[in-house]
From Swiss-Prot:
Protein name (Swiss-Prot/TrEMBL): Indole-3-glycerol phosphate synthase
Organism: Methanocaldococcus jannaschii (strain ATCC 43067 / DSM 2661 / JAL-1 / JCM 10045 / NBRC 100440) (Methanococcus jannaschii)
Catalytic activity: 1-(2-carboxyphenylamino)-1-deoxy-D-ribulose 5-phosphate + H(+) = (1S,2R)-1-C-(indol-3-yl)glycerol 3-phosphate + CO2 + H2O
Gene: trpC
HAMAP family on file: IGPS_A
Similarity comment: family membership: Belongs to the TrpC family.
InterPro entries: Aldolase_TIM (IPR013785), Indole-3-glycerol_P_synth (IPR045186), Indole-3-glycerol_P_synth_dom (IPR013798), Indole-3-GlycerolPSynthase_CS (IPR001468), RibuloseP-bd_barrel (IPR011060)
Amino acid sequence: MKVLDEIVANRKKMVEIEKRKDIIKNLRSFIDELDIDVEKKRKLRLSKAIKKAKEIKNPIITEIKPSSPSKGSIREINLEDVKNIANEMVEGGATALSILTEPKYFNGSYKNLIVAREFDIPILMKDFIVDFYQIDVASEIGANAVLLIVSSLKEDIGEFLDYAKENDLECLVETHSEDEIDIALDAGAKIIGINNRDLKTLKIDLSTTEKLAPLIPKNKIKVGESGIYTKEQLNYVLKFTDAALIGSSIMESENIREKVREFVIK
């Protein structure tokens, strides 16, 4: 079984468990405990933040990613660590935060996103979305955008885009091939991610961005994803995109604030 297929199959099972447990109710209680004004934070927009950031700095979506299938454990963190890391990322100049909420393969959690929601910055809920229920959760916990992966949702992606819009959420629609870009565009995607990592093999090729970006109309927002470890690599990706999503290299850094700042400065 390919890595993506395995993750998606597991996520479908987990979502059914989440539904039965009515986790939204528990998450609401957690939000109340932290006294976070989720309603106020819902007004933040990823697309607007990227456009504004481009005028003065490199627009970087920094990712809180504890582990991954390709690297294993990246950084062991608790909720207090998440808050501190998010703060360092914001102080470093991040345009938005991406929070992993997939629990088994990335060691993420919805509570990580809620803790990071304290900050006035757009938040992308990064997960393998396979069910509308996950979009309900994203809306409840204060996410501003969700990740939709074309290779897992395929032609159904239009329905998920529509449902997210109904819940006042933007979508980062992830692609890795010409066919997937066609599907994303046909579905009406406005923010399109180009993943330099092949989710079937986990191999990275930064030239994927260069090959695919010209296929995306200029009125769309393009985001380069995966494989960015140096400023040189970032500059290469940003030649073809409007923003970049960076996770592992920041999470591995001993000084997250300075690492983000290094990427952000033009």
